[in-house]
Amino acid sequence: MNSENSFSSSEHITVLLHEAVNGLALKENGIYIDGTFGRGGHSRFILSQLSSNGRLIAVDRDPRAIAEAHKIQDLRFQIEHNSFSHIPEICDKLNLVGKIDGILLDLGVSSPQLDEAERGFSFMKDGPLDMRMDTTQGLSAEEWLKQVSIEDLTWVLKTFGEERFAKRIATAIVDFNKSAVKNGTEFLSRTSQLAELISQAVPFKDKHKHPATRSFQAIRIFINSELDELESLLNSALDMLAPEGRLSIISFHSLEDRMVKHFMKNKVRARIFPKVYHCEKIKFSVIKN
């Protein structure tokens, strides 16, 4: 065990660090999963609370997060390059189904991902239109926007961004790329281009919110199948947990928040706890021969 490496300082400030970890009710010898390693803030703190017999499995689909995780030199720790929806397969591989004392998820995009312009998550910084959390697979936002129809894009913007001007924005994006094909000009390929196009398409501006906020969120959620990933994990999480195991989730936007609250509410109501049997005290007496 190397506690110095386990709880090293980081420029990234972990959101709700103590609140989320406290929700796990850590046992010093427990087995835990950090399903969204990110830059390791939660994982390092969990490790600092575990004994030499504790264990932490971290999961992330971002290659940069995996690189950060490899900096942790601790025999109690291991990293899995995968999305958290694959936690059941990871548990099965490690023979840990039904043995996990706690699972932690910090949903959505991380601040380091937003800060890195080349990742394409932020409309505040110019970068390539990528938006993939795992840059090794799947379509980038640029590639998807080249082929999407107005109808499908409108649905995505409404469903995942709750954008009231979805049709206007979708039409502007698809028409721009169609024009590029016709005129031999460049497709939408930069975050700044997309943000400006959305701003022009939106008839009314919110003083407190950038016009592209909801659209960027919607496209990112779709590209990364974020809500599908969450639903898949929620459907299997309880089977992974040991008796008295904990599930601690940080959610930010209303869509994932509703999913988590609905899950928690239903499971609390529907959970069937084993019946407790009470028996009379057995009296013993000493028999002398």
Curated annotation (Swiss-Prot):
Gene3D superfamilies: Putative methyltransferase TM0872, insert domain (1.10.150.170), Vaccinia Virus protein VP39 (3.40.50.150)
Gene Ontology process terms (BP): rRNA base methylation
Top-rank EC class of the record's enzyme: transferase
GO cellular component: cytoplasm
Pfam families associated with the record: Methyltransf_5
InterPro entries: RsmH, SAM-dep_MeTrfase_MraW_recog, SAM-dependent_MTases_sf
Reaction equations catalysed: cytidine(1402) in 16S rRNA + S-adenosyl-L-methionine = N(4)-methylcytidine(1402) in 16S rRNA + S-adenosyl-L-homocysteine + H(+)
Compartment annotation: Cytoplasm
Domain of life: Bacteria
GO molecular function: rRNA (cytosine-N4-)-methyltransferase activity
Annotated keywords: Cytoplasm, Methyltransferase, rRNA processing, S-adenosyl-L-methionine, Transferase
EC number(s) stated in the UniProt entry for this protein: 2.1.1.199
Broad class of the protein's primary localization: cytoplasm
Protein residues bound to S-adenosyl-L-methionine: 40-42, 60, 84, 106, 113
Entries under SUPFAM superfamilies matching the protein: Putative methyltransferase TM0872, insert domain (SSF81799), S-adenosyl-L-methionine-dependent methyltransferases (SSF53335)
Keyword rRNA processing recorded: yes
HAMAP family to which the protein is assigned, alphabetical: 16SrRNA_methyltr_H (MF_01007)
Task of the protein: Specifically methylates the N4 position of cytidine in position 1402 (C1402) of 16S rRNA.
Similarity comment text for this entry: Belongs to the methyltransferase superfamily. RsmH family.
Protein name, as recorded: Ribosomal RNA small subunit methyltransferase H
Species, as recorded: Haemophilus influenzae (strain PittGG)
Lineage of the species this protein comes from: Bacteria, Pseudomonadati, Pseudomonadota, Gammaproteobacteria, Pasteurellales
Encoding gene, per UniProt annotation: rsmH
